[in-house]
Amino acid sequence: MRILGIDPGLRTLGWGVIEQRGSRLSHVANGLCHSDGDDLGERLLSLHNQIVEVIEEYRPDQAAIEQTFVNKDGAGTLKLGQARGVALLTLAQAGLPVGEYAPNRVKKTVVGVGHAEKEQVIHMVKLQLPGCLPKGADAADALAIAICHAYYGSAQALSQREVRA
């Protein structure tokens, strides 16, 4: 199963693709989507188009995205939510099932503690995906989100099916 992880951001959105075969994980690709300028609509469209390119090139089977946390900067949180919304819309248009994970859960899964530093996440992603060179902290976070989904995604899908039944 191929999993696309997304770390949403308006200025820089990280993405990472991993392959899961049984309990084995391997790195496929990772990168950053950038949006600059003053026009919010154009920036969101740019992110959408870049995510579409990633999906078309790497053909993931499932996706995972980090949940938004609310902080003291309301305007910043709103912009993050808009970028996350565009990412979710793009994934839905591609027909991908999406898992959503809290930042602390991702860090606890990959590092072992929920309040890990960026450097710890990067280090553990490299250990769990040999040969992987993340193209930045946001790409490493996206790979960590994909790893988290590899561990919890199947169980989450199963529990959602059980709730519906």
From Swiss-Prot:
Binding residues for Mg(2+) 2: 66
The record's Gene Ontology biological-process terms are: DNA recombination; DNA repair
- What keywords does the record list, in alphabetical order? Cytoplasm, DNA damage, DNA recombination, DNA repair, DNA-binding, Endonuclease, Hydrolase, Magnesium, Metal-binding, Nuclease
- MF annotations from Gene Ontology: crossover junction DNA endonuclease activity; DNA binding; magnesium ion binding
- What is the E.C. number? 3.1.21.10
Q: Where in the cell?
A: Cytoplasm
Q: Which reaction does it catalyse?
A: Endonucleolytic cleavage at a junction such as a reciprocal single-stranded crossover between two homologous DNA duplexes (Holliday junction)
Write down the top EC class of this protein.
hydrolase
SS bond list: none
Residues binding Mg(2+) 1: 7, 138
Catalytic residues at 7, 66, 138
What are the annotated GO cellular component locations?
Answer: cytoplasm; Holliday junction resolvase complex
PANTHER family xref list: CROSSOVER JUNCTION ENDODEOXYRIBONUCLEASE RUVC (PTHR30194:SF3)
Q: What does this protein do?
A: The RuvA-RuvB-RuvC complex processes Holliday junction (HJ) DNA during genetic recombination and DNA repair. Endonuclease that resolves HJ intermediates. Cleaves cruciform DNA by making single-stranded nicks across the HJ at symmetrical positions within the homologous arms, yielding a 5'-phosphate and a 3'-hydroxyl group; requires a central core of homology in the junction. The consensus cleavage sequence is 5'-(A/T)TT(C/G)-3'. Cleavage occurs on the 3'-side of the TT dinucleotide at the point of strand exchange.
Give the family per the record.
Belongs to the RuvC family.
NCBIfam families according to UniProt? ruvC
What is the protein's quaternary organization? Homodimer which binds Holliday junction (HJ) DNA. The HJ becomes 2-fold symmetrical on binding to RuvC with unstacked arms; it has a different conformation from HJ DNA in complex with RuvA. In the full resolvosome a probable DNA-RuvA(4)-RuvB(12)-RuvC(2) complex forms which resolves the HJ.
Identification of the protein by name? Crossover junction endodeoxyribonuclease RuvC
From what organism does this protein derive?
A: Ruegeria pomeroyi (strain ATCC 700808 / DSM 15171 / DSS-3)
